[in-house]
């Protein structure tokens, strides 16, 4: 029963439930918790569960008007992180009804909205989420997916090759188009707008779209294969973004691009729906991801951002390169590359996968290896990423 004693109440009395059996419909989260000195890990884990679901800092009479048992998040398991002092993995189960269907925005607002500024925690990181089919089925997911993309491009059995046009800022639209033509004519499948190329004074978006489309069709005619240029539709408003996507559709180009973290999940999901309805592929750049995922003990791991993107919608997403980094990085990167491409991914802690994830029939996303790679990296990249990937040079 709800106690009405005045004052601050320990969260663990209500929200730490080690005997809880998780339901197939629960959304499960794994948090890396670093409590403040003197705060027991159970209290810290329960605080996260409470603050990201139904809890507040005291008992209020309106608690009696609803069923907390039905709606509260529960911290159901805590384990110390091996090799780290005062760090714990807290597992939290959220009832499905806490989340709006088909909204990545609402999912993140609930799970990571408030808790990260919490006084009882020194640091907090969301390491993984288990999205149940009951929830993932409320999302459209990628506009087309890997198989449909290959059919559209008529390119099979190999990674796709792309490059980013440089210098990324400062070229006129006509010279930019020239560079696109040379790259595509020379044998690349795709060229790419840089993520910062939107619509600046030296090159307005419509001029760029026209010259790139011209370059594309010329290269297609001369090579006899289908070519693409990721036209960056990211804009200051969602309406402007959709206007740019509509212009790309009218030009008949195969693919547009979006910066999904700076643009936001709501805008991204709208664009993904537009792309499916209008036969456009959607390339996703992850500008700003390191702000969120770089710290080991605070923020959100990229595998969560990647899962969220698969739900929100995108056909390609940048996912790091692995080349030249540590071995451990390689396994972790391959873990979230599998989460992007495969239907069913087994729990595997060595690859950072905390939960078994079943996507059922949601289309896959092509991982894009991009950032500081050159031709000598090719053998390593093809071995790491396999056929279903985009190797993006420049």
Swiss-Prot record:
Reactions mediated catalytically: 2 (2R)-3-phosphoglycerate + 2 H(+) = D-ribulose 1,5-bisphosphate + CO2 + H2O; D-ribulose 1,5-bisphosphate + O2 = 2-phosphoglycolate + (2R)-3-phosphoglycerate + 2 H(+)
Keywords: Calvin cycle, Carbon dioxide fixation, Chloroplast, Lyase, Magnesium, Metal-binding, Methylation, Monooxygenase, Oxidoreductase, Photorespiration, Photosynthesis, Plastid
GO annotation, cellular component aspect: chloroplast
Record site: Transition state stabilizer: 325
Binding-site positions, substrate: 114, 164, 168, 286, 318, 370
Cofactors that this protein relies on: Mg(2+)
Pfam families recorded: RuBisCO_large, RuBisCO_large_N
Cofactor notes: Binds 1 Mg(2+) ion per subunit.
Binding site for Mg(2+): 192, 194-195
Catalytic residues (UniProt): 166, 285
Residues found modified as N6-carboxylysine: 192
Location relative to the cell: Plastid, Chloroplast
GO MF, one example: monooxygenase activity
Modified residues (N6,N6,N6-trimethyllysine): 5
Summary of the function given for this chain in its UniProt record: RuBisCO catalyzes two reactions: the carboxylation of D-ribulose 1,5-bisphosphate, the primary event in carbon dioxide fixation, as well as the oxidative fragmentation of the pentose substrate in the photorespiration process. Both reactions occur simultaneously and in competition at the same active site.
Family designation: Belongs to the RuBisCO large chain family. Type I subfamily.
Subunit: Heterohexadecamer of 8 large chains and 8 small chains.
Other information: The basic functional RuBisCO is composed of a large chain homodimer in a 'head-to-tail' conformation. In form I RuBisCO this homodimer is arranged in a barrel-like tetramer with the small subunits forming a tetrameric 'cap' on each end of the 'barrel'.
Entry protein name: Ribulose bisphosphate carboxylase large chain
Gene name in the database record: rbcL
């Amino acid at each position: 029963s709800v106690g009405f004693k005045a004052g601050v109440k320990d969260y663990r009395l209500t929200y730490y439930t080690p005997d809880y059996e998780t339901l197939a419909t629960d959304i499960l989260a794994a948090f890396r918790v670093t409590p403040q000195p003197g705060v027991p890990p159970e209290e810290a884990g329960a605080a996260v569960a409470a603050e990201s679901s139904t809890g507040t800092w005291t008992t209020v009479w309106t608690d009696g008007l609803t069923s907390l048992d039905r709606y509260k998040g529960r911290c159901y398991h805590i384990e110390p992180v091996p090799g780290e002092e005062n760090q714990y993995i807290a597992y939290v189960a959220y009832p499905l009804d806490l989340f709006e269907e088909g909204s990545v925005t609402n999912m993140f607002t609930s799970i990571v909205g408030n808790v990260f500024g919490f006084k009882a925690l020194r640091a907090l990181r969301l390491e993984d989420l288990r999205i149940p089919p009951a929830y993932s089925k409320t999302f459209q997911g990628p506009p087309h997916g890997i198989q449909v993309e290959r059919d559209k491009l008529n390119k099979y059995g190999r990674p796709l090759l792309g490059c980013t046009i440089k210098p990324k800022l400062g070229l006129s639209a006509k010279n930019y188009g020239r560079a696109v033509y040379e790259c595509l004519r020379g044998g690349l499948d795709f060229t790419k707008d840089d993520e910062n190329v939107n619509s600046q004074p030296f090159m307005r978006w419509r001029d760029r779209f026209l010259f790139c489309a011209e370059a594309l069709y010329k290269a297609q005619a001369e090579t006899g294969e289908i070519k693409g240029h990721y036209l960056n539709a990211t804009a200051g408003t969602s309406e402007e973004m959709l206007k740019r996507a509509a212009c790309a559709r009218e030009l008949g180009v195969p693919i547009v691009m979006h910066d999904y973290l700076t643009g936001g999940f709501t805008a991204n999901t709208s664009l993904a729906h537009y792309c499916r309805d209008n036969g456009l592929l959607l390339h996703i750049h992850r500008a700003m991801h390191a702000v969120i995922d770089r710290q080991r003990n605070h923020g959100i791991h990229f595998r969560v951002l990647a899962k969220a993107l698969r739900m929100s919608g995108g056909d390609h997403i940048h996912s790091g390169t692995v080349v030249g980094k540590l071995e451990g990085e390689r396994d972790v990167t391959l873990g979230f590359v599998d989460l992007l491409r495969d239907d069913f991914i087994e729990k595997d802690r060595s690859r950072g996968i905390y939960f078994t994830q079943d996507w059922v029939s949601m289309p896959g996303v092509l991982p894009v290896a991009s950032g500081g790679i050159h031709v000598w990296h090719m053998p390593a990249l093809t071995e790491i990423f396999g056929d279903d990937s985009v190797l993006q040079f420049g």
